[in-house]
Each structure stands twice: as structure tokens, then as C-alpha cells.
């Protein structure tokens, strides 16, 4: 067994034993957390088995190659496969973020730039929906505030995986680097003189919280209802179906008007509220932890301007890792893996460096 994985494999076996104990399921929060962690560690066991197999095959092929030179090609192939597996192993050499395996709630908000910014927010929404489709994830629009020209002033989407994932490969683990300000440079549809304008939209990515993850006292909530409004502010419903929830202790406010049912809007608003409260708690913990590592390394954290989309040059630039590519049309069609891989690799390198220092 490969030593860097031994602790994680032992943890996987321990959790398996805990989940087999009926008493654990009397505590839904604990059972859910254990199940999530168990699924997250499953790829570790698979990787360990694969490493053992390839190492054994390589040792045997090397011995055979001493007697028969025709086995040298097999030695080379197995050596390359082992190198790929060891590269995957790097992801397990740093602590696995338990939130990486969670589903996510993604919020896109138009920023500076008026209607053009709202149109760009719509472009970003489509990009993420197409990416989710490519990954086989399920999406659900929780709330949407459309603009006059078909964009979005703000929109919230739940993104769910269909099965367990490895480190950094869950929905939240994959999308978490998207948080920040995204900037667009192009000629707006509202521009008659053909001048290039710059506008922006903000993206927030939160791990989705279950009810058992975040306890909300109903007495801490102020719930207001109002009529839904569409583009231009016109009413789209004759009943007070839209819901605004204020979490009094923190001042967090969530509004939902996407559904015709007040109950459905309330449920969606509570989902977003739980995610925001969990995200706030996570950021507080990360902020405290970052004080200890700040002098060691700068990881790929959210920053003000994370990415620029230049339509005239068909160029995408991620400013955190110096990534540039002239395939903007493909990226906006959901081909995000290349830039997300670059961000994940930079983050892993930074965390490995911090761990070694």
C-alpha cells in the first residue's frame, strides 16, 4: 500500500464501520457527514488499488524484459501509467476539504455597466449551465431577476452532482474558484457607435448546506411577502408569492420570486440562506486559518477581478494564475475544464508548498 494514502484508507475503513452501526443513524447530521466523507474517500481506495496493481505489473515486466527485450515497450507503458497515477496522488497529500464534495449554490449578479452587465450575467449563467450539462450535473434555477433585454440583474442556481467525486472534483470543489468579479470587454448591443465598453458581473459560489448543517431559529427570521416583478418592474403575479427572508442576527437578506407558489419561493430562499450562513462560517474559519499561513504562501483565493472576457480578441484571461487562451467562444459554451484545471493545479502547488515549509 502506498504510504501517503495509508491514513486516508484507514479513515475510509473506520467510517465504513461507523456507518454499519445503526446507532449512528440516530444522529442525522453525523450520519450525513460520515456518508459524505465516505464517498469522498472512495476514490482514494480505488487509487491505492490501482497503484498496487501497476507497481506489481511494472516489477514483473522489468524482470521479463531482462530475458525478453520485447517486454521493454510494456515497461515503458507501465512506467508512464505509474507516473500518471503518482501525479493524481499529489491531490491526496494535502488535507481534503470536506466541503469539496458538496453540491453548490451559484449566484451571478450584474455589476457596473447597466443593461450590458445584465446581459453579461446572462452569458455567465449560460456558461455555467452548459458546463454543468457537460459534467452530467443537475441544475435548478432557485431565483431569477431578469432585465429588460433578456439578461439578469441577479440569478441563483443550485448545482447537484449525480454521484461521488474525488478531491476537488465535486461540484463545489470544481466551481469554488469561480467566485469573484468577472469583467467583459465588448461592443454592447446598446452601443450605436461601435465602441468597446467594459462592464462586470459578480459570481458567488457557496457549498450547499443541508438543514442539519445549519440550525436556523425561526424566531431569528423576518419573512416578508410581496408581488413578483419581471423586466421593467411590471407585476408578473396577482398574488403576494415573492418572499424576502431576513436573518436578523447576521442581517443576511434573501429574496426569491421565481416560482408562482409562495411556499416554493420560501423553500428556495431558505436554501440560499442556509448556504450563505454556511459560507460565512467557512470564510470566518478560513480567515482565522489564513493568518497562520499568510507569511508562507498565497493560495488561489477569491479576489476582486478574477477573469476578463475580451470578445474582440476571442480571449479569456484569468488574472490569478496568468492563464490566457483565445477560445472565448468555447469557454462561454461551457468548456471550462482547462482554466479550472489550471486554477486547481496552482492551488494544489501552493498548499503543498505551505505544507512543506
Curated annotation (Swiss-Prot):
Disulfide bonds listed in the record: none
Gene Ontology MF, one: translation release factor activity, codon specific
InterPro entries for this protein: PCRF, Pep_chain_release_fac_I, Pep_chain_release_fac_I_sf, Prokaryotic/Mito_RF, RF-1
Pfam families tied to this protein: PCRF, RF-1
GO cellular component: cytoplasm
Modified residues (N5-methylglutamine): 234
PTM annotation, UniProt: Methylated by PrmC. Methylation increases the termination efficiency of RF1.
Origin: domain of life: Bacteria
Keywords from the UniProt entry: Cytoplasm, Methylation, Protein biosynthesis
Subcellular location: Cytoplasm
Keyword Cytoplasm in record: yes
Cytoplasm among keywords: yes
The protein's role, per its UniProt record: Peptide chain release factor 1 directs the termination of translation in response to the peptide chain termination codons UAG and UAA.
Listed HAMAP family: Rel_fac_1
Similarity comment: family membership: Belongs to the prokaryotic/mitochondrial release factor family.
Protein name (record): Peptide chain release factor 1
This protein's encoding gene: prfA
